[in-house]
Regions:
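Short, low-complexity Ser/Thr-rich regulatory SLiMs
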Residues: 51-53, 125, 138
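Bacterial N-terminal signal peptides that target proteins for export
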Residues: 1-12
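C-terminal partner/receptor-binding element of secreted or periplasmic proteins
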Residues: 128-159
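Short, solvent-exposed coil/turn segments at beta-strand boundaries
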Residues: 55-58, 127-131
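N-terminal secretory signal peptides
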Residues: 27-88
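N-terminal signal peptide c-region/cleavage motif recognized by signal peptidases
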Residues: 20-22
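Mature extracytoplasmic domains of secretory-pathway proteins
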Residues: 61-125
Length: 159
């Protein structure tokens, strides 16, 4: 007598999706990294610097610096990265705003743990000051508040 176990058959696919998900979400270009702590086994702790372009507004690029946990767990993708990051966004060409811009729209995210924790970047438009404002935050609550950083891009004539 054979039993049909659909969950057991689907387990490899589910695990593959779980581990591939964070890699697919990361749309940044690596700029550089600095090793911050030596680990005898596995990769060192480091700070990564990554760049990404705003997917809806041409002419804006952002640089995100964030810690990456090393060691055995970090090397296997099982460690949780610290929740802080810094952000710097700049105008890199002419900016034309779309007719409708959603306040707080997500422009970038990267997984910082095996499950549930992410570093996100969202965009706002400050019409009064004619500037795009980018906010990065971790989705993990730390000491009663979320770790965050902000960067503003004044929209200037180009050329």
């Amino acid at each position: 007598m054979t039993h049909n176990f659909p969950l057991i058959r689907a387990l490899p696919l589910l695990l593959g999706m779980l581990f591939a998900g964070p890699a697919l979400a990361d749309k940044a270009d690596p700029v550089g990294e600095v090793s911050t702590a030596f680990k005898l086994v596995g990769p060192n702790h480091k700070i990564l610097v990554e760049a990404f372009d705003d997917p809806k507004i041409a002419g804006v690029a952002c640089y995100l610096a964030r810690p990456k946990t090393g060691g055995v767990k970090g090397g296997l993708g099982l460690a949780e990265d610290p929740s802080h990051a810094s952000l710097s966004c700049h105008q890199t060409g002419p900016i034309t705003l779309p007719a409708k811009l959603k306040a707080g729209e997500e422009v970038f995210d990267v997984s910082t743990s095996l499950v549930f924790k992410e570093q996100k970047v969202v965009r706002f438009y400050d019409e009064k000051r004619n500037a795009l404002v980018y906010l990065t935050y971790s989705t993990k609550l730390v000491d009663g508040s979320y770790k965050s950083a902000v960067s503003a891009v004044p929209i200037m004539p180009w050329g």
